[in-house]
Amino acid sequence: EIERPLIEVLAAMELWGVKLDLDLLKSLSVELDRRLKKLEKQIYEMAGQEFNINSPTQLSQILFYKLNLPASKKTRINKGLSTATDILEELAPLNPLAGAVLEYRQLAKLKSTYTDSLIKLVNPETGRVHTSYNQTITATGRLSSSDPNLQNIPIRGEMGKKVRQAFIPEKGHELLSADYSQIELRLLAHLSGDPLLRQIFLEDRDIHMETARRVFGEAVELFPEEMRRRAKIINFS
């Protein structure tokens, strides 16, 4: 009664596909390439030498041995010193190189995973990208998407939002975005009767930011979007 009627709907959605503004994606790819080259030059200047920015080993040599940035217990891993995102976020207030590498990684992922890949995935006959909607994969009953994953298009940051603008409607039509506001946690507040949760929602405060402030403290002010994203994962876990 629930899943079977949806099969035809999803099949039609997959067949119809999603229209893309290829000119916009191509211009974004060029812009990202320009910004990456500029960032690369700045990173080399900060480091005082050229190195492979994509190599964790070479980056750790620069950060922890050449620049003598502090390495915490969390930083130490079996094969050396970690340069994972959370480590670079901790180092960013101490040296601009760490922040520049974070930005470089974000832009490089946008270019390789989205602008360049989506262009290649457009069907030449339909001019659209055709994803697969997985109806019975997730434990929660939500849909997932693959080949490509159109449910994971970036929304954070200036360039991420520009990638989303490449998804366009047919002429004379509009794309509609509708979403419940933190519906799962509102239900949790109602069913549990938790006074703090209820108060946060009654005062129309952002539950994810409230969690971020309690968990991450001052780091929230430095990386509000990233800290909110992590707090959201914590809340739903």
What is each model feature region?
Residues E1-E158, I168, G172-E174, S181-E184, ...:
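Conserved "right-hand" nucleotidyltransferase catalytic core of DNA-directed polymerases
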Residues F51, A71, L196, A219-V220:
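Secondary-structure boundary/capping signal
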Residues L121, L197-Q199, L222:
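Short, contiguous acidic/charged loop-to-helix segments that flank catalytic cores in large enzymes
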Residues K161, L185-R186, H190, D206-E210, ...:
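Feature representing long, continuous alpha-helical segments
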Residues R164-A166:
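A generic local secondary-structure boundary/capping motif
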Residues H173-R205:
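Structured ligand/cofactor/substrate-binding pocket environments in proteins
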Residues E203-R230:
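Generic long, charged, amphipathic alpha-helical segments
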